[in-house]
């Protein structure tokens, strides 16, 4: 058909007679209506086009028109005539109703209903996007096709165009916008509006903050890199603070500013010369001086010159402050002890070392140079530096040693080390030539020290206890206040009885006690149950991020529950969300799905809303549940030329005779251009018609959409698909966005977590995983680790980031101040304080401190050596007060040349007296003699006997033997040779020594230490050690007396019988025949000759029991001297039995004592005990010995060895 303007008629050809219609379009946009009403206001807006054409017209595609419109709007041009833009200033509701009307424009006609060409409507749903959506309408008169779309204005986003985001970088925010309108904070900014700067990592936000990223500006009263240090009270000297403007004093300090020293004595030790310091008042003290000293600090002696403080001949003058020394020429200093340095001009050449002397100097030259100033090259081989070598070859500026096999080093003094950790239990490996030897510590033995003999070797006694070795174990001698098998039990009166309750252990302190409480109790005596919040004033941060004392109990808004919930704090820092109606989930982030059960009927699409739902009905249905089919027969679509039947979204006309077509308006054809809608093809069947619908449509006239665009459902993650012909829209659930709901909304943008917390993004929720030490929903709260009172009683807890620090009171230590510092007393020695457990050396003795008691070895160190000088004043300056330097006996120099040494002696105290002296023959159970033989070539020049004796006294073995008794070691040149030194060893006092075992073990220990060669360079030259000790043997006449008595009794009876028999026989022979008398010797009586004991001495019988105990001198030679061939022992006869004669001779001398002498080679020591034979050996026949040759015991050192 054709649309004709005015009252024009159509021509026979079907066109308009006068003029066609001037068509333009009006558009009305209003809220969604299940049943569209064309009347009423256009609540969303309206628009109209200019005249677009006449009967039929076609406009360019909407996409090109839209692009052209945007281009013209930018250039200021006119809008495309076919484009209608309806702006709105509200959130797009997504559902809408669109009414489109085609009108005929005629200036000559008053507008009325007749001018309306066609009206169509569409109710549906559409999301904002750039794509166009096509709509097809087939009305009663006209057929319309148009495209629609909804676009958000610039800087508006989301499905409702109500999310505003405009990028900015100013005072009001620092962010950009993503494609979904989410604010993306720039680096260094956080918060909802990206206005909060990200402070420096670790910055304490309770005491500081920042205005620019990376900053940490402290609040008033706080300081430090992270604003975690409080500012102390101004002027606070020796104190600290936990809160600002406080001054908590350190130990021993007091006063408002902690500047008053409460223990001046302990901090400064002002008193000297043994004065006792007393704390009088803060910053004040008093010194109690010993006799002979005055002054505030006991620094001034009463008779300052009495001790002759001026050295080197200086004269002493007492002054008010003490003394002054007037020094002689060449000396200076307060005590005239500073010599003029003649070495200032560096007179020594060739790298020699200059030693300043009085009025001169001495050059100590390198080994390859000699002369007064080291200007001459020396023959290094003259000093025999090569120890284990074939020969020494002198070189220019040096020498070369041709070493023997097995040795190396410049002097062939290094033995190839065969020690590789074989010795156990701390044993010392001694390297030998092609071998090794383990020197075991006390208590261990075996080749590798693998056998334990001494139970105290592992030091089992604790806290200063002294271990005593027993046969079957050990015993600990505990210090005062300790007991138990290992001195581990404190028995001080503070803890007896135990004041600590609830199973706590008591520790004794110096003036108090300390209870180590279990976890559930606290207080002085562990009697107070430990509360979670001591005192009830808890400042625990609750799970919602608020302090419990800062708000009323109940629900509080918090970002953790989102915009649809309220946070409720639970015990233990937890929380719970109370959700608004229609929401559920841990964080109230899930909108309850009210579309469960599919309430919409007849294919309606259910749209979930907050606590409600809405049904989007397909064409042909309406109502809240899409259960109402509107009557499509209204108004009269059959034009009163037939009967109308209502269908779903359609109608059917049964036309009267002569009328055809869908609306009964034609008499010729069943089909026209508008019979089938939405592009359907009409087929005329004479009396009826049939529509072939395109894809996506169905129905008799293709008016029902199949909604095939939502099959399969393109919307994911629970999105609802709303189809409209060949297009669709997705209604996404909260937390999802995008055309098909594939993008999870980033709930972590902008950054919601503080203090380095990590944000975990969920679906419409987020969670902050806080860094260690922080808590709360957004990690802005520093956890107060001190709330649980982790520090022990009496300690102060200081909260820190991710931890705490306990400030301990005096006497306590440990991370929680739970460990007790055992108070011990120091030891004083020669004016020096030594703490408990420390060790030091005094002269030749070793000492250790045990709770105020000095435990020192008791070795008599001898007189102090001094250099003899022609000036008498210089002699006394080298010796302690009260002693004088006197010349020693001649012959003390072992390797000349030696300095002119003397010794400091005094009349009081006198050295201990002992009969055990070197170069004498005295030996008893408290006397041993050691004879040390030296290799003269290895002894350094200037070595004296006193130096060797000092080295032996300083041996650890010597000190260990002198723990309980005074040990005397006296040395002298031996008479046996020029390179031997004799050492006499004895204890003082000797009256309570039971036997000789102590002196023997001491001598053996000293010999073993000397053989190690590791203590002194002098002992490296020792080649042989000879040991002489005494063994007290038992009486040898115990079995001799009864045996001899039995023998003599038998002989006497036999003689009596024989005499009687022989007398009778002779008498009978005289009477019978009187034969001549036989005067020949009867040899059978030879065995009856009297037997004399060769060891009998006048006045003592071998058979008697009244004689004293036999004392046996054992002679042991480990390197025996050779005997000349044919050498015989003294006596009237020698039968060639040299061994027996020698033994008889030894037995015949003295009163039964046997001298035991051992010559010990340095490399190995053997002991071969030679006990006296039994009674049989004493009665054995042997050569007669001239008893006149026997000397007294005092003359015998070792028989046959002198």
Swiss-Prot record:
Its main location: membrane. Residues 1059-1202 are cytoplasmic. The modification Phosphoserine is found at residue 1080. It holds the Pfam family hEGF. Residues 1-1037 are extracellular. The chain crosses the membrane at residues 1038-1058. It is a single-pass type I membrane protein. GO terms for biological process: auditory receptor cell fate commitment; cell differentiation; cell fate determination; embryonic limb morphogenesis; epithelial cell apoptotic process involved in palatal shelf morphogenesis; gamma-delta T cell differentiation; in utero embryonic development; male gonad development. Gene3D superfamilies: 2.10.25.140, 2.60.40.3510, Laminin. Glycans are attached at residues 107, 525, 574, 707, 1015. Residues 1070-1202 are annotated as: Disordered. It is found in: Membrane. Residues 1070-1080, 1147-1159, 1185-1202 have a biased composition (Basic and acidic residues). Keywords: Calcium, Developmental protein, Disulfide bond, EGF-like domain, Glycoprotein, Membrane, Notch signaling pathway, Phosphoprotein, Repeat, Transmembrane, Transmembrane helix. InterPro entries: DSL, EGF-like_Ca-bd_dom, EGF-like_CS, EGF-like_dom, EGF-type_Asp/Asn_hydroxyl_site, EGF_Ca-bd_CS, Growth_fac_rcpt_cys_sf, JAG1_1/2_dom. One of its GO terms (cellular component) is plasma membrane. SUPFAM superfamilies: EGF/Laminin, Growth factor receptor domain. Putative Notch ligand involved in the mediation of Notch signaling. May have a role in neurogenesis in the peripheral nervous system, limb development and in the adult brain. This is Protein jagged-2. It comes from Rattus norvegicus (Rat). The gene is Jag2.
């Amino acid at each position: 058909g054709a649309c004709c303007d005015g009252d024009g008629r159509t021509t026979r050809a079907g066109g308009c007679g006068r003029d066609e219609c001037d068509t333009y379009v009006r558009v009305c946009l209003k809220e969604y209506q299940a049943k569209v009403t064309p009347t009423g206001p256009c609540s969303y807006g309206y628009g109209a086009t200019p005249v677009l054409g006449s009967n039929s017209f076609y406009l360019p595609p909407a996409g090109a028109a839209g692009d052209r419109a945007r281009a013209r709007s930018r250039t200021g041009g006119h809008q495309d005539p076919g484009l209608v833009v309806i702006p709105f200033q509200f959130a797009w509701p997504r559902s809408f109703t669109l009414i489109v009307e085609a009108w005929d424009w005629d200036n000559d006609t008053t507008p009325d209903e007749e001018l309306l060409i066609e009206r169509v409507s569409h109710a549906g749903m559409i999301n904002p996007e750039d794509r166009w959506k096509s709509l097809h309408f087939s009305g009663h008169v006209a057929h319309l096709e148009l495209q629609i779309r909804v676009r958000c204005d610039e800087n508006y986003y989301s499905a409702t165009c109500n999310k505003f985001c405009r990028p900015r970088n100013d005072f009001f925010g620092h962010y950009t916008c993503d494609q979904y309108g989410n604010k993306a904070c720039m680096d260094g900014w956080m918060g909802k509006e990206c206005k909060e700067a990200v402070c420096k990592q670790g910055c304490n936000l309770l005491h500081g903050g920042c205005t620019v990223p990376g900053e940490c500006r402290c609040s008033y009263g706080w300081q430090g890199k992270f604003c975690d240090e409080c500012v102390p009270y101004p002027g606070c000297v020796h104190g600290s603070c936990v809160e600002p403007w406080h001054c908590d004093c350190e130990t021993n300090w007091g006063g408002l500013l902690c500047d008053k020293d409460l223990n001046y004595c302990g901090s400064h030790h002002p008193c000297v010369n043994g004065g006792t310091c007393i704390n009088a008042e803060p910053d004040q003290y008093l010194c109690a001086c010993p006799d002979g000293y005055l002054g505030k600090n006991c620094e001034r002696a009463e008779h300052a010159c009495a001790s002759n403080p001026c050295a080197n001949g200086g004269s002493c003058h007492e002054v008010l402050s003490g003394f002054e020394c007037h020094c002689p020429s060449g000396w200076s200093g307060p005590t005239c002890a500073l010599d003029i340095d003649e070495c200032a001009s560096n007179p020594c050449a060739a790298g020699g070392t200059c030693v300043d002397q009085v009025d001169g100097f001495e050059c100590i030259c390198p080994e390859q140079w000699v002369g007064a100033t080291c200007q001459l090259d020396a023959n290094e081989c003259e000093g025999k530096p090569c120890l284990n070598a074939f020969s020494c070859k002198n070189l220019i500026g040096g020498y070369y040693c041709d070493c023997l096999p097995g040795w190396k080093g410049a002097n062939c003094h290094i033995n190839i080390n065969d020690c590789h950790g074989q010795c156990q239990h701390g044993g010392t490996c001694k390297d030998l030539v092609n071998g090794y030897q383990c020197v075991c510590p006390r208590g261990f033995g075996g080749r590798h020290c693998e056998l334990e003999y001494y139970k105290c070797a592992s030091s089992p006694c604790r806290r200063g206890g002294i271990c005593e070795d027993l046969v079957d174990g050990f015993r600990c001698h505990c210090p005062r206040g300790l007991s138990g098998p290992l001195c581990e039990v404190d028995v001080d009166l503070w803890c007896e009885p135990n004041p600590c309750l609830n199973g706590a252990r008591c520790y004794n302190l110096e003036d108090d006690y300390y209870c180590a409480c279990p976890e559930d109790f606290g207080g002085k005596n562990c009697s107070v149950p430990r509360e979670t919040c001591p005192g009830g004033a808890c400042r625990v941060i609750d799970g919602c991020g608020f302090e419990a004392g800062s708000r009323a109990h109940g629900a509080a808004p918090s970002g953790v529950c989102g915009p649809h919930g309220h946070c409720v704090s639970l015990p233990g820092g937890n929380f719970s969300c109370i959700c608004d109606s229609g929401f559920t989930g841990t964080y109230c982030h899930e909108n309850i799905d009210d579309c469960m059960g599919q309430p919409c009927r007849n294919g309606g699409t259910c749209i979930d809303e907050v606590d409600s739902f809405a049904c989007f009905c397909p064409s042909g249905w309406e109502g809240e549940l899409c259960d109402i089919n509107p009557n499509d027969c209204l108004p009269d679509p059959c034009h009163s030329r037939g009967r109308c039947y209502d269908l779903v979204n359609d109608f059917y006309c049964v036309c009267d005779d002569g009328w055809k077509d869908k609306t009964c308006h034609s008499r010729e054809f069943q089909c026209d251009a508008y019979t089938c809608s939405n592009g359907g093809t009409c087929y005329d069947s004479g009396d009826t018609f049939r529509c072939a619908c395109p894809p996506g449509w169905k129905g008799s006239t293709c008016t029902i959409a199949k909604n095939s665009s939502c099959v399969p459902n393109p919307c994911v993650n629970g999105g609802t698909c709303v189809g409209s012909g060949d297009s669709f829209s997705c209604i996404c659930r909260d937390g999802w966005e995008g055309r098909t709901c594939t993008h999870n909304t980033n709930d972590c943008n902008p950054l919601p977590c503080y203090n380095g917390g990590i944000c975990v993004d969920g679906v419409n929720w987020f969670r902050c995983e806080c860094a260690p030490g922080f808590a709360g929903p957004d990690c802005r709260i520093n956890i107060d680790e001190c709330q649980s009172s982790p520090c022990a009683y009496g300690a102060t807890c200081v909260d820190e980031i991710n931890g705490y620090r306990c400030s301990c009171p005096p006497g306590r230590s440990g991370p929680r101040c739970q460990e007790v510092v055992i108070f011990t007393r120091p030891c004083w020695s020669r004016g020096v304080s030594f703490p408990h457990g420390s060790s030091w050396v005094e002269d030749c003795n070793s000492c250790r401190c045990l709770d105020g008691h000095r435990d020192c070895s008791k070795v008599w160190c001898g007189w102090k050596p001094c250099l003899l000088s022609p000036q008498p004043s210089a002699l006394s300056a080298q010796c302690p007060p009260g002693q004088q330097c006197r010349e020693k006996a001649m012959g003390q120099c072992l390797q000349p040349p030696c300095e002119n040494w003397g010794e400091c002696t005094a009349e009081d105290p006198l050295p201990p007296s002992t009969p055990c002296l070197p170069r004498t023959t005295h030996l008893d159970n408290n006397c041993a003699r050691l004879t040390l033989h030296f290799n003269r070539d290895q002894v350094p020049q200037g070595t004296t006997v006193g130096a060797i004796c000092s080295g032996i006294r300083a041996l650890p073995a010597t000190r260990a033997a002198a723990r309980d008794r005074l040990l005397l070691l006296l040395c002298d040149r031996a008479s046996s040779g020029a390179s031997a030194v004799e050492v006499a060893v004895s204890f003082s006092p000797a009256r309570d020594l039971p036997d000789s075992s102590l002196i023997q073990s001491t001598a053996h220990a000293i010999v073993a230490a000397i053989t190690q060669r590791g203590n002194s360079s002098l002992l490296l030259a020792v080649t042989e050690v000879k040991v002489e000790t005494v063994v007290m043997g038992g009486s040898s006449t115990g079995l001799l007396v009864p045996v001899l008595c039995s023998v003599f009794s038998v002989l006497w009876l036999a003689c009596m019988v024989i005499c009687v028999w022989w007398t009778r026989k002779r008498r009978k022979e005289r009477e019978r025949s009187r034969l001549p008398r036989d005067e020949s010797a009867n040899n059978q009586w030879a065995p009856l000759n009297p037997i004399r004991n060769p060891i009998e001495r006048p006045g003592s019988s071998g058979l008697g029991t009244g004689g004293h105990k036999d004392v046996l001198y054992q002679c042991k030679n480990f390197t025996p001297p050779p005997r000349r061939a044919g050498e015989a022992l003294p006596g009237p006869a020698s039968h060639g039995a040299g061994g027996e004669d020698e033994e008889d001779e030894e037995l015949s001398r003295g009163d039964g004592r046997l001298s035991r002498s051992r010559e010990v080679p340095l490399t190995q020591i053997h002991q071969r005990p030679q006990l006296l034979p039994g009674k049989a050996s004493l009665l054995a026949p042997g050569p007669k010995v001239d008893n006149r040759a026997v000397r007294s015991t005092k003359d015998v050192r070792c028989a046959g060895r002198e």
